[in-house]
UniProtKB/Swiss-Prot annotation:
InterPro entries: SmpB, SsrA-bd_prot, SsrA-bd_prot_CS
Function: Required for rescue of stalled ribosomes mediated by trans-translation. Binds to transfer-messenger RNA (tmRNA), required for stable association of tmRNA with ribosomes. tmRNA and SmpB together mimic tRNA shape, replacing the anticodon stem-loop with SmpB. tmRNA is encoded by the ssrA gene; the 2 termini fold to resemble tRNA(Ala) and it encodes a 'tag peptide', a short internal open reading frame. During trans-translation Ala-aminoacylated tmRNA acts like a tRNA, entering the A-site of stalled ribosomes, displacing the stalled mRNA.
Biased composition (Basic and acidic residues): 135-156
Residue spans crossing the bilayer: none
Name the UniProt record assigns to this protein: SsrA-binding protein
Keyword flag tRNA-binding: no
Family annotation (Pfam families): SmpB
Protein source organism: Shewanella loihica (strain ATCC BAA-1088 / PV-4)
Region (Disordered): 135-163
Length: 163
């Protein structure tokens, strides 16, 4: 039985959404934390967890970074006087130095910018972790899978050997 005075955590978990395919499809060399410019209905939907990062990517236009393809499904109880576009481009808030670095690497060296996860910072701001990396080839993906399976098998063997 639970106590009546037991404190329940009113804070939602820190991670809102993850792009699970990102680590499988890309080899990241550097990661950045970016803020998001959101509307009120988007924040409400994010608090409920109606976010999908799987098909999204970041592109640079006019010296600014934008998140494209991220789906934030509007709530049924959202305001009726605001037109909710779940697939709109959302501006990323980065420092000028970070934007210049990303711009240079993407244009000159063929890097891609991919969102990795969305999370709460201090339970007030929505942050997006983006990764700067290159796409993996098919043989790289197979090597990663073999390495992961070998680690699992090795840990099982060590566990049984300790008995």
């Amino acid at each position: 039985m639970a106590k009546k005075n037991a404190k329940k955590s009113k804070n939602p978990p820190a991670t809102i959404a993850r792009n699970k395919r990102a680590n499988f499809d890309y080899k990241f060399e550097e990661k950045f934390e970016a803020g998001l410019s959101l509307m009120g209905w988007e924040v409400k939907s994010i608090r409920v967890g109606k976010v999908n990062l799987s098909e999204s990517y970041v592109f640079l236009r006019d010296g600014e970074a934008y998140l494209f393809g991220c789906t934030i499904t509007p709530l049924n109880t959202a305001s009726t006087h605001v037109v909710c576009d779940p697939m709109r481009d959302r501006k990323l808030l980065l420092n000028r130095r970070e934007l210049d670095k990303l711009q240079g690497l993407v244009e000159r060296q063929g890097y891609s910018i991919v969102p990795i996860s969305m999370y709460w910072r201090k339970n007030a701001w929505v942050k997006l972790e983006i990764g700067l990396g290159k796409g993996k080839k098919e043989h790289d993906k197979r090597d990663d899978t073999k390495e992961r399976e070998w680690k699992i098998e090795k840990s099982r063997t060590m566990k049984h050997a300790a008995r």
